[in-house]
Amino acid sequence: MRLPKLEGKTGSTELNRQFLGYRHVDAPDEGAFYEMENVTSERYPLMAPRSPRAKLYTLQNPGGLCAKTALAWTENGKLYYGGEAVADVSEGEKTFVSMGAWLIVFPDGVRYNTADGTVDAIGQKNVTDGTVNFTLCEADGTAYSDYTVSETEPEDTTKYWLCTGSDPHCLKKYSAATKLWNTIPTTYVMISAAGIGRNLAEGDTVTVSGVLDSVGADLNGEMLLQQAADDAVVVVGFLDETASQTNAVTLERKAPKLDYVVECNNRLWGCSSEENEIYACKLGDATNWNCFAGLATDSYTVSVGSDGPFTGAAVQLGYVLFFKENCLHKVYGSKPSNFQVSMTACEGVQPGSAKSLCMVGSTLYYKADHGVMAYDGSVPESVSAALGGVYYQNAVAGTERGRLYLSMQDAAESWHLFVYDTETGIWCREDAAHAAAFATLNGNAYMLDADGCVWKLTPAE
């Protein structure tokens, strides 16, 4: 019996030599994956499973996470630094800003000094309870105890003359050299009462209110403190005579209500959507936002002309950036007299994605409404074509060793944790982690998830 001759089939082998990551697009390239879970590009060009995470803490009612020389977070109305409770704060979501040794918590305005453990506040409000005394004095607080009050020149030239014949009244001193009464250009008033200067300092700008018209209405308003002690302050002013009152006097060091805050060049910078303004604190002094003495160290305020609320703030290569949905404002200059604010129309930060602003190397990344953008100082460009046409929102970002971690929510309210390798341009999807905040300490990334767990992302110890 003869059998038919069979033709052998030749086999073929396809070898993929390069991993191209996550590409959620029609017909992804060979080496790319439409769906992905727990994959990393750390071993590029090879595909590899991501490193396991290490759970460090489980927090109750956390408000955020950050890092200086140690991890910091808020939990149940307490600020923790390095695992130790260091200050009281309100509950709710927080923004952390580092300025020198200070860690500042917004919107509370509470400051913790990581070097010496000092705790204080940006704002301060003192209201008197009892008698308030007002005394004409010199800049150092020394009272003018011996002077003549009259409309015309007094015969006694050894004393000061409080001239009531001029408008406004003034204080004069006789000069033996010129034989003339010379007006003292600046006079001061000491306001003394129990606790009136508590937690205030020389150089603070405060709002004074409650001074009776019969005492000196001009003492109400914005005042620069020349001297400050717990029970007395000295301000520029004038009195016809020593006076007192029992009505309460209020001294308040105010800070603007800020939507977003960053630190740059030893100043805090913030913005207010309600006022459509940008603010900077006094140089090196986060407690003073209303000091306008014509000095290079002054505070700064400017209104912007763009429409819509601010959606985020960041610092990139020494420049402060304030974002809206369709533009960014960039601050130039080194002091209030030469500060300038420019506007660039572009894809700004998506509302609700302020936490996506993240520096990786010299490039700023953020989530815009139509994708993930990279900004190198010129014009933002999209780097998220691989994510396809899926709409994402509420993005939160962190970084580790040149990689951008980005946790986002899709239109179906499902969460995704993506990782973008900024060196290779490869995207990976790790899992469905819902990040509330990221922090980077000693080159390692940490994540606070929506369940209150703090994770060390990679590698696990």
Regions found by a protein language model. Give the residues of each.
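N-terminal beta-propeller domains
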Residues: 1-84, 133-140, 256-330, 408-420, ...
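Surface-exposed loop/turn elements that mediate protein-protein interactions on large endomembrane-trafficking
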Residues: 42-51, 77-88, 111-126, 276-301, ...
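Short, surface-exposed terminal/edge motifs of secreted or surface/virion proteins that either
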Residues: 77-83, 109-124, 159-185, 215-217, ...
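Extracellular/surface-exposed low-complexity repeats and stalk/linker segments enriched in Gly/Pro
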Residues: 86-92, 132-160, 185-186, 387, ...
